[in-house]
């Protein structure tokens, strides 16, 4: 997301792998009027007005589009405050988080090798 300040941008993920084009259209054509001329600090009001004004409320296309915009606004706000977003949202609550990795390969041996690489990276603790 671009701002009126040169070089100040925000990044957000609006991934909807089955329908990327409608998400782009939702951002460009539907959400843009809710964003233009607004202050980054108005994140909650932007979200609420965008969400409740929509005919497609709670649908996957709008939810993905709005999620990406919301993330980008928080990214911009963090840059303006010179703080990581997690500090803006209350601070770090843990040193690490569980992750899921998927080993793949053309042969069973390749899968085993990739799994060993993930284990060596520390992605498996043996706990759930």
Predicted regions and their residues:
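Metal-dependent enolase-superfamily TIM-barrel catalytic cores that perform enediolate-based chemistry
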Residues: 90, 95-128
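Metal- or metallocofactor-binding catalytic centers and their adjacent structured scaffolds
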Residues: 4-80
């Amino acid at each position: 997301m671009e701002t009126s300040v040169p070089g100040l941008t925000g990044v957000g993920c609006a991934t909807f792998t089955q329908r990327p084009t409608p998400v782009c259209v939702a951002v460009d054509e539907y959400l843009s009027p809710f964003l233009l001329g607004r202050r980054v600090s108005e994140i909650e009001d932007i979200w609420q007005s965008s969400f409740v004004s929509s005919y497609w409320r709670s649908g996957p296309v709008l939810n993905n589009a709005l999620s990406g915009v919301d993330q980008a606004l928080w990214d911009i706000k963090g840059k303006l405050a010179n703080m990581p977003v997690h500090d803006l949202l209350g601070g770090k609550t843990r040193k690490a988080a569980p992750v899921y990795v998927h080993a793949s390969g053309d042969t069973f041996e390749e899968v085993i090798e990739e799994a060993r690489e993930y284990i060596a990276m520390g992605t498996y603790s043996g706990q759930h």
